């Protein structure tokens, strides 16, 4: 078996399933566990990813208006790697290499088609289904991994709910333009007994009117340092809310085995009286 994973979350799933030795290629975004960095890179963005969130948003929109995709797949590298399995996704054409990108690469080079596993994580349930789907495609049992993750999440949620507090939380997955976090993030928030606010593209006035108790910034693909650099867009002092930054790249917007750590990050932020800050500085910080 020879696996090429073209999504960072799928690479984590592959390794959590004990299949890391079978992975032969990765995407430009696959960076965990660290050992995968030595694998051949099979993809790249077709736009400049440097710059602030407004500039990147504009470049992505311009690229989508004129090109088939915002990513390229190196079909020559794929051909050389001779994969038996390629893992991609159909959830978001902006977030990662998509199924259509892979199909174009396969049609250009391959006469014998590898198995293509397309993940679609729109919710917590989908994340667990994707783990099982990928495990089944590779001939292993994914249920023990799902059980371990779900057990950890239930324990975190039970501790949070025991506080009997329900803070009103605004999770932001992009800074400029402002976008409220959707998909599994509202579910994580509500698992802890909190209320999740504003899950769509929004304006600053919407934030002011919502009057959240807590704001959690988790820009898609951004680490703490890069998120910190994006905080200048808005006057956070206008809010009474406590404001926090998280590593959206490694945790919050990565739907893989570390989703339980994402829940833990939210729990440490929202219920500091009940959780030791074990991930502070690594996964989150106060603004």
PLM features per residue range, with description:
Residues 1-287:
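N-terminal ligand-binding lobe of clamshell/alpha-beta domains
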């Amino acid at each position: 078996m020879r696996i090429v994973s073209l999504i960072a979350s799928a690479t984590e799933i592959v390794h959590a399933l004990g299949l890391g030795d079978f992975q032969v290629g990765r995407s430009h975004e696959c960076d965990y566990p660290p050992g995968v960095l030595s694998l051949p890179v099979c993809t790249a963005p077709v736009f400049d990813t440097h710059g602030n969130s407004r500039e990147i948003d504009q470049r992505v929109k311009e690229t989508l208006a004129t090109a088939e995709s915002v990513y390229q797949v190196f079909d020559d590298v794929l051909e050389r790697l001779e994969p038996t399995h390629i893992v991609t996704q159909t959830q978001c054409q902006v977030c990662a290499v998509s199924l259509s990108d892979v199909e174009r690469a396969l049609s250009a080079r391959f006469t014998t088609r590898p198995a293509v596993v397309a993940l679609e994580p729109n919710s917590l349930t989908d994340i667990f289904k994707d783990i099982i789907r990928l495990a089944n495609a590779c001939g292993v049992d994914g249920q023990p991994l799902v059980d371990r993750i779900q057990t950890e999440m239930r324990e975190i949620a039970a501790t949070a709910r025991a506080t009997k507090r329900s803070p009103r939380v605004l999770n932001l997955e992009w800074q400029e333009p402002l976008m409220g976090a959707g998909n599994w993030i509202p579910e994580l928030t509500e698992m802890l007994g909190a209320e999740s606010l504003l899950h769509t593209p929004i304006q600053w006035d919407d934030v002011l009117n919502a009057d959240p108790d807590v704001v959690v910034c988790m820009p898609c693909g951004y680490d703490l340092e890069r998120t910190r650099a994006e905080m200048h867009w808005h006057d956070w002092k206008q809010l009474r809310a406590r404001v926090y930054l998280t590593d959206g790249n490694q945790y919050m917007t990565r739907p893989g085995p570390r989703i339980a750590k994402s829940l833990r990050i939210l729990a440490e932020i929202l219920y500091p009286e009940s959780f030791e800050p074990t991930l502070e500085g690594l996964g989150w910080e106060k603004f």
